[in-house]
């Protein structure tokens, strides 16, 4: 009887640890969870268009990074600083298809801004913690993001 209880308790502990809250388990392997979204830093340089295409191929609903508040920006900053040497990553913000009408590739509303004026695509300059316009044909590392 004691052995049965021990095994049952062990299975219960294993089940509870695997079930968790459910949210983090919906992230793919090597992706990080934050506030209902999964994020992954890619240390491979691509043009903005190629990076966005790559993100959409990773998971349904995945796009280049969109940022909506300073806390989210700080989370991404901490994730990328350790991995990337140049500290510049593509973001989903652009006006490639609709000049002067800025929007995120994931369709989210532009509700947080931190940039200098320039060209059609945006990068997040990690070391300076601000956004900057960049030529879309230049190559940079990137972060993909999707909603859990």
From Swiss-Prot:
One GO CC term on file: extracellular region
All copies of domain C-type lectin, residue ranges: 34-145
InterPro entries xref list: C-type_lectin-like, C-type_lectin-like/link_sf, C-type_lectin/snaclec_domain, CTDL_fold
Keywords per UniProt: Disulfide bond, Hemostasis impairing toxin, Secreted, Signal, Toxin
Entry keyword Secreted: yes
Function: Interferes with one step of hemostasis (modulation of platelet aggregation, or coagulation cascade, for example).
Name of the protein described by the UniProt record: Snaclec 5
């Amino acid at each position: 009887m004691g052995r049965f209880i021990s095994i049952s308790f062990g299975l219960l502990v294993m089940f509870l640890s695997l079930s968790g809250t459910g949210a983090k388990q919906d992230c793919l392997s090597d992706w990080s969870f934050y506030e209902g979204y999964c994020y992954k830093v890619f240390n491979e340089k691509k043009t903005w268009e190629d990076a966005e295409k790559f993100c959409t191929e990773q998971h349904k609903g995945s796009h280049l990074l969109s940022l909506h508040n300073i806390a989210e920006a700080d989370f991404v900053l901490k994730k990328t600083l350790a991995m990337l040497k140049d500290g510049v990553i593509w973001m989903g913000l652009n006006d490639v298809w609709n000049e002067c009408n800025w929007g995120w590739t994931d369709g989210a509303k532009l509700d947080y801004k931190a940039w200098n004026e320039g060209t059609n695509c945006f990068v997040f300059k990690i070391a300076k913690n601000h956004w900057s316009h960049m030529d879309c044909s230049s190559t940079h590392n990137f972060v993909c993001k999707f909603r859990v």
